[in-house]
């Protein structure tokens, strides 16, 4: 079986010489300390106005590793981590790598019963927790075997002045974090304060196959699973990044927009920034405005489409507001104009500093991408990946960007497009399921061999492949064009419908902001398309424009692809991992269909 890579010269899209040639056969602790040893004065972290150098980061990680060692955490044991993006993430990665422990990263938005399951399934005896999660951990700890809870606060990393201001704000807001009277709970600073820095443990030796990190899947298409990776996988992932034409240069600043419990945030952002001796500008929030608010602080951002959509919307509204205020000669208008002009200057200066915006986690349509790039006068690089392949696997070349595609395979990545039913490789131009092979595929779904074997397959040449579940085709230049999820295929009578095709047609209508198409159960067919639509202008009457939308679909789509239902929503729902929540829309859609059927029945009676 030959992969599609053999038909395209992908090397031309990669650097001939990588930014950095890493030794992959070492621990993450070893890689970061060896890469930064001659540049310890460089900034490793920016957090809420305070910076930490590589020297200070490594010293603090050594102390944390020793503190873990002192409570008898050994090579191969598991530590659960529930935290926002803040320096404790870097300290945890390095310290737990140093002692050979396995890190289990848990989504902060998980339900209590799921947190219990994640902790117990990975046999964690120690937890590192963001202080706002303390009430949750306190309520469930007796249902686990946890012996120690290390509580970290953003205030641990603030400058003295900002820390005082933050404390005053908490007091005003009535926020008070009190540790329970329980010896299992300890504050981070107390946990490490008595460590003897003159008697630190020796780092463990590297083991290529040792499970080192556990992350959760997004759960957007099924029950969330725990995905096991090795340190080699993380090292291999950053090596592949070094072959892209993106500016992962020593001393540059990377904006950390994605939380650490998502592998795109943990591996491609936080760990990668340390591997390249860059500064990680960490934003502790997960809101859509984080990139916009931090413009001017970074050279490259790895974020999700929703972050760039927010930037685009704010910049358009800012310019529109300034135009209106310039027509008003009142004193209040002049004051507001001055404020708006100051904000515009900040935004434009920040965009000018940024060398590139990288987008992943969800799609950006071709028209939308072009419009945003023209507005920012900056390249937006589309990327694609999944948890099983440790984040980014396919990236658009910065200087050969093709809107509408997700790019080309990164160095060391092989892809093939197959018939989902026969697994036969399809020729260039035909739509099928994307399979991915590389040296950093996941080890397994924890304690779930059946699900592991469903997604991880071995061909006749003993090469491992991961089924992505995504539909795509490869164009004549080797670029990969997404066509939705294989698992989202709508089966209408004898037809298989890809929702992406319908979404592109509807999204091209000027007054449409966003569109998601899902399959819903119908009285006549097993499944039919329902289009959920967000309008740009909230004052528009959806009833008045719905016929125009349907006419557009009738003009451009085969009859069987024209949606049976068109519904308006205020905004598209997203999963905790910033992916469109198809399951929620399917449930909403089926509820709408049932209600329509019930009303028809009542009328007949």
Predicted regions, residues:
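Gly/Ser/Thr-rich phosphate-binding loop
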Residues: 299-300, 314-402, 414
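Conserved structural elements of the adenylate-forming
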Residues: 58-64, 193-195, 208, 227-247, ...
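AMP-binding/adenylate-forming catalytic domain of the ANL superfamily
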Residues: 3, 152, 555-580, 598-604
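Conserved AMP-binding A3 loop
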Residues: 53-55, 203, 212-236
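Conserved AMP-binding/adenylate-forming
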Residues: 47-52, 65-110, 259, 496
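Conserved AMP-binding/adenylation subdomain of ANL enzymes
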Residues: 235-253, 261-302, 306-338, 342
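Conserved ATP/PPi-binding loop(s) of AMP-dependent carboxylate-activating enzymes
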Residues: 408-412, 424-457, 497
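AMP-binding/adenylate-forming catalytic core of the ANL superfamily
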Residues: 110, 438, 443-444, 453, ...
